[in-house]
């Protein structure tokens, strides 16, 4: 056995031992939580332990397929492989909002679009959709993905059907929609400009609205039907766009929505309100309360740069409603990285890029993904002139991709640091020890 192999085996044994010790500890569950005990706070969705960091676990068993699904999954092997990496076992809940679920949705859209070239239909019937979704889940699990994607991403067999959209026939679709206008707007999008100008998104909305009007029965609120028709429009687009750009386009459109919303759940703020009011008379107590509160947020999920800005704005606005007028983000040195899952300590906070990105598999190091470990951007305190954290009118400049810091090692081009599975394995053990 080589020295490297000995090291890997020893490390794996240490990790497993630490995990077992943590389970046998007499420490009460409440002691794992931050100082604040929220009334309705979510339990941190963290797996107990990751697979061996150096030798990633893959379910090598052949998936048991139904044989009743007509979709050609083998024609989308690369897409499915990327999806399995983005939804890798224990990391799927942590990457769900930014990587896993958007990639899974794009994969389903593209596969259904490809199938329409043979069937002339942009949706499956209910029976087939159940078999096909089950088969895809089996294939993904066989490649290392989580077996709980239906819950993590709220994916149901109805997502493969037309749902309430009245048009699924390709010929009928093309005779109803201004396809030239749709293609012109979506043929080649800039992922940054599109989120502000919304040219492609508006074209998709127009097309979805047009085909939704073909329904025989009218609805008081047509928004659900239009959303269902948007899925049909995206499947048609997947057949017309350059194959090398389809995934990037769909992921780019998804990221426009992702970056507009803070995915964190904010528990009550009684401790902060009690310690940070009265013109900040007790700065030490205030910052201790803020640190305790933020430590709870740090156990929820990984988020992007722009989501962190949304979260900072949301939290700051809530604090202002408690009559906290001082910029306690500045006083207590709260940065944007403090709103995301932490890796060991606050200096290693992980903010994902605001542009679409994928996890990468390496046979030696396992699963890695790009984290912004270099940009220490202070969390902005909301001002009266800033009514909202608009994606296009951010109060601070945030790089779409991580910027290189001279004080940190350049492990890859452009100073991008890859956070490998080993680091997160250690994090998970520390959180539970």
Curated annotation (Swiss-Prot):
Please indicate if the UniProt record lists Lipoprotein as a keyword. yes
Mind telling me which residues form the propeptide? 406-433
| Signal peptide positions (record) | 1-26
One GO cellular component term noted in the UniProt record for this chain: plasma membrane
Annotated membrane topology: Lipid-anchor; GPI-anchor
Predominant location category: membrane
What InterPro entries does the entry give? At1g61900-like, SPARK
Q: List the subcellular locations.
A: Cell membrane
- Which superkingdom does the taxonomy of this entry point to? Eukaryota
Glycosylated residues: list them: 59, 72, 125, 159, 210, 275, 282, 323
**Please, where does GPI-anchor amidated alanine lipid attachment map on the chain?**
405
Q: Which UniProt keywords apply?
A: Cell membrane, Glycoprotein, GPI-anchor, Lipoprotein, Membrane, Signal
Species the sequence originates in: Arabidopsis thaliana (Mouse-ear cress)
- The protein's name in its UniProt record: Uncharacterized GPI-anchored protein At1g61900
Please tell me whether the keyword Membrane is annotated for this protein: yes
């Amino acid at each position: 056995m080589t020295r490297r192999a000995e090291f890997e085996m020893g490390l794996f044994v240490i990790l497993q031992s630490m995990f077992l010790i943590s389970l046998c500890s007499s420490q009460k569950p409440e002691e794992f939580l931050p100082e604040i005990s929220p009334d309705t706070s979510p339990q941190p969705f963290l797996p107990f332990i990751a697979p061996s960091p150096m030798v990633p676990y893959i379910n090598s068993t052949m998936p048991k397929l139904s044989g009743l699904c007509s979709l050609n999954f083998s024609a989308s092997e690369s897409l499915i492989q990327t999806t399995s990496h983005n939804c890798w076992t224990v990391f799927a809940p942590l990457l769900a909002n930014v990587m896993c679920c958007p990639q899974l949705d794009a994969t389903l859209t593209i596969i259904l679009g490809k199938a329409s070239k043979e069937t002339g239909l942009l949706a499956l019937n209910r029976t087939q959709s159940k078999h096909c979704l089950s088969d895809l889940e089996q294939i993904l699990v066989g490649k290392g993905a989580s077996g709980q994607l239906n819950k993590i991403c709220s994916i149901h067999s109805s997502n493969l059907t037309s749902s309430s959209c009245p048009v699924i026939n390709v010929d009928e679709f093309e005779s109803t929609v201004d396809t030239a206008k749709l293609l012109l707007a979506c043929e080649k999008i800039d992922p940054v400009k599109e989120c502000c100008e919304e040219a492609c998104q508006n074209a998709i909305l127009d097309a979805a609205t047009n085909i939704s009007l073909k329904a025989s029965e009218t609805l008081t609120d047509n928004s659900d039907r239009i959303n269902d028709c948007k899925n049909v429009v995206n499947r048609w687009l997947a057949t017309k766009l350059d194959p090398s750009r389809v995934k990037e386009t769909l992921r780019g459109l998804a990221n426009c929505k992702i970056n507009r919303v803070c995915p964190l759940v904010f528990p009550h703020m009684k401790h902060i309100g009690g310690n940070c009011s009265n013109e900040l008379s007790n700065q030490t107590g205030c910052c201790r309360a803020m640190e305790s509160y933020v430590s709870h947020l740090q156990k929820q999920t990984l988020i992007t740069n722009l989501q962190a800005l949304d979260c900072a704005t949301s939290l700051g606005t809530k604090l202002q409603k408690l009559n906290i007028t001082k910029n306690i983000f500045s006083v207590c040195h709260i940065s944007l990285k403090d709103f995301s899952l932490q890796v060991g300590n606050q200096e290693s906070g992980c903010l994902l890029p605001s542009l679409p990105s994928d996890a990468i598999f390496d046979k030696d190091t396992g699963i890695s993904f790009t984290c912004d470990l270099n940009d220490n951007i202070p969390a902005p305190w909301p001002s009266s002139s800033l009514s909202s954290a608009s994606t296009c009118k951010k109060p601070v400049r945030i790089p779409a991709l991580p910027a290189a810091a001279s004080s940190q090692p350049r492990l890859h081009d452009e100073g991008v640091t890859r956070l490998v599975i080993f680091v997160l394995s250690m994090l998970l053990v520390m959180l539970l020890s």
